[in-house]
């Protein structure tokens, strides 16, 4: 579905693209030749008439004469992408980006080519860079790019970021089996390239969970809750199903319901730290004494996990165990050197145990990092996202 959608929207953006290329015929050097202008016009006419093979040959001829014709490289790239000639399309979009580095739409298309060519790291980097630069005001193209970003993040195990990307699609009204399959894998923390077959129990669970997650992403929480409860009634022991439901209930601001589901996941998987970390994080402000046990258990189960030490340090600090909090927070700071909350928490703990010089250094470090954040215009990544790719399933 999304592949067909992309083919459609690429045809639609060829007009507004001229505003982004800044490479029209009158601007490019060496275009005084009337023959070259005529050749470029013929290439565009063949493209618009659907004579794609002819258009491709004409674009190649024109670009051999004028290799700085940005719009020509774009048109050639889209033709080759639509023909599933991704390696050639990649080269064309690389030319566009080289000639106009701020061309966000071409950067997005380059990322889509890299996705098809099995270059996930490069694809994700270019797609995310395209979002910073800006993609043309074409919602269909934006949806395709956002979906592929979600897939790449899911396969990389960056489930929280993938959830945010896919939720934006659901909030915009997009629904499909393809989207549900990917979102189901995100919610159940599966890094598989494709969801299980729909003829299997696992495949059906993934689809149901994906639909529920999409409803939650669209803020239709009652409908999402109904979908989750239906699938849990049928397969209550499916791995991370209760965890996924707990995350949905957190989004719906149902604190008690979320804790109940995380505890149910612990009962199903006693050695899994994820639900313990979620409870510890959720109880930090609500009931730190209750959350403390779950953070302690998480650290015992997986002592190499820095996030466990971070949450344990915060909960110890909140419950007045300042001396015990310090080594936990210091361990976390080594793993998350840019996280300002660790510095201010350590400053508090140092002050409470009579270490004013250490407290002053921690506050100074906090101020320095905040100044860097303001200068860059970017804040540090939310630390609870460190659950992704840092905890054993």
Model-derived features: positions:
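Alpha-helical segment of the N-proximal tetratricopeptide repeat
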Residues: 34-65, 82, 204-226, 230
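Canonical tetratricopeptide repeat
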Residues: 75, 109, 144, 148, ...
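Helix-start (N-cap) detector for alpha-helical repeat units in TPR-like alpha-solenoids
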Residues: 36, 70-71, 104-105, 138-139, ...
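Structural signature of tandem alpha-helical TPR/SEL1-like repeats
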Residues: 48-58, 82-95, 117-129, 142, ...
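TPR/TPR-like (Sel1-like) alpha-helical repeat modules
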Residues: 115, 128-132, 147-154, 159-177, ...
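Terminal, low-structured helical/coil segments at or just beyond the last alpha-helical repeat
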Residues: 22-27, 175-214, 351-393
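Structural marker of alpha-solenoid helical repeat scaffolds
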Residues: 65, 99, 133-137, 172, ...
């Amino acid at each position: 579905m999304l592949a067909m959608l992309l083919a459609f929207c690429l045809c639609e953006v060829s007009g507004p693209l001229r505003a982004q290329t800044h490479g029209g015929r009158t601007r490019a050097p060496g275009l005084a030749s009337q023959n070259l202008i005529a050749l470029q016009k013929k290439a565009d006419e063949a493209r618009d008439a659907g004579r794609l093979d002819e258009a491709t040959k004409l674009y190649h001829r024109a670009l051999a004469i004028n290799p700085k014709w940005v719009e020509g490289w774009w048109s050639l790239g889209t033709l080759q992408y639509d023909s599933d000639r991704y390696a050639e399309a990649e080269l064309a979009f690389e030319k566009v980006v080289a000639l106009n580095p701020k061309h966000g739409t071409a950067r997005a298309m380059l990322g889509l080519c890299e996705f098809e060519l099995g270059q996930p790291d490069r694809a994700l980097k270019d797609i995310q860079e395209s979002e910073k630069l800006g993609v043309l005001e074409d919602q269909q193209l934006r949806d395709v790019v956002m979906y592929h970003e979600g897939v790449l993040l899911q396969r990389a195990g960056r489930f929280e970021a993938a959830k945010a990307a896919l939720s934006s699609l659901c909030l915009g009204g997009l629904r499909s089996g393809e989207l549900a399959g990917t979102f189901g894998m995100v919610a159940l923390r599966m890094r598989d390239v494709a969801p299980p077959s729909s003829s299997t129990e696992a495949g059906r669970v993934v689809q149901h969970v994906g639909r529920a997650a999409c409803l939650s992403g669209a803020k239709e929480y009652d409908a999402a809750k109904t979908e989750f409860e239906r699938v849990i009634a049928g397969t209550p022991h499916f791995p991370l199903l209760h965890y996924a439901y707990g995350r949905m209930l957190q989004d719906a601001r149902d604190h008690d319901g979320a804790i109940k589901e995380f505890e149910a996941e612990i009962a199903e998987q006693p050695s899994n730290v994820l639900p313990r970390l979620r409870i510890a994080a959720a109880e930090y402000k609500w009931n730190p004494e209750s959350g403390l046990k779950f953070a302690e258990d998480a650290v015992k189960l997986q002592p190499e996990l820095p996030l466990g030490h971070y949450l344990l340090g915060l909960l110890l600090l909140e419950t007045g165990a300042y001396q015990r909090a310090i080594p936990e927070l210091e361990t976390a700071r080594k793993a998350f050197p840019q996280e300002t909350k660790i510095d201010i928490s350590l400053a508090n703990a140092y002050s409470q145990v009579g270490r004013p010089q250490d407290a002053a250094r921690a506050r100074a470090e906090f101020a320095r990092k905040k100044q860097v954040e303001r200068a860059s215009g970017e804040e540090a990544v939310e630390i609870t996202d460190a659950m992704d790719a840092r905890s054993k399933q």
